[in-house]
Amino acid sequence: MSQMANAITKRERDCLVFIEEYTGKGFPIRLHEIASTMKVKSPTAFNVIKRLEEKGLVESRNGMVKLTTVGKEAARKILIVHRTFESLFCQSGIPMEKACEEASDIDFLIPENNARKVLKRIDNPKVCPHGKPIWGR
């Protein structure tokens, strides 16, 4: 995913990550579930999904949404960066929930290769503070 061509917003990031975590169970997600989880109205969620669809990151059909191959890769990269920086923040003494919140504010802005450098500096943890795997190592 080229950073300039497919730059995403924080709201789009939140939506991508939620869809990845939900659909990892193998099922598409309903638009109203996305709206409810993101605490936005359905038209707002619809607009976010449309933007993600235009960027080739999701497919939407009959109110059901799933990630495309490109969307899965984008979400995977975001989660690698997120879990890396969450680990760094916790190792630096920031409480876990605050570390997660802070990582969510920047994880979609940092290239994966930079996160991998940070990962090496913090001794390559296998999982984030929540116990979720830091993929792709």
Positions of predicted regions on the chain:
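Short coil turns linking two alpha-helices in DNA-binding domains
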Residues: 41-42
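Short alpha-helical segments that sit at the start of domains
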Residues: 1-17
